[in-house]
Amino acid sequence: TVSYRNNYDETEKEPTVLPSQYPNLLVNGAGGIAVGMATSIPPHNLGEVIDATNAFIENQNITISQLMKYIPGPDFPTGGLIIGKDFIKQGYNKGRGSFKIRGEIEFEEKKGSREILVIKSIPYQVNKSLLIEKIAHLVRDKKIEGIRDLRDESNREGIRVVIELRKGVEPETVRRQLYKLTNIENSFGFNTLAIVDNKPKILNLKEF
């Protein structure tokens, strides 16, 4: 049985907890600011969290390093590569930290030997439409040169933003410029503040 309490303006009742058999807060993640406090908890893979939960049940003395064998890092819905695993370890141990997420940009070759770059993932919370708009502005302002065409071919199977290059342009040069001048590479800050027993607390991985 779950106890109920008044909500923030006392107009209705709400459950004091939302019970589940795994740490749902860690799976879904959370972010926001209220009453001078902020939280930023990244989402995680459900299967990995359940495996770690089972390992914790079997061994209550399991360490955070051992839990990280099951949960190596966050799992973002928009994909991307996490850079800086030491910073993830710091976040899991202390509840605070920051790491970089880099969207994946791959090379492809079109007919006629014209090369293209394809953005296949973007950092968490980066707006794809605004990213494309930013690239278009950089091309227009000649801060990135060598791009012939830019189009969004994303569908239900995933993200696919095609950047068609002019002949003779070095793809790696354009890719480096995209990482430098846009938020295809972005930072995510750990701040695992949660309410525990009606008090704010910074949680480490094991405390979730």
Show which residues each predicted segment covers.
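Intrinsically disordered, low-complexity regulatory segments
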Residues: 3-28, 33-208
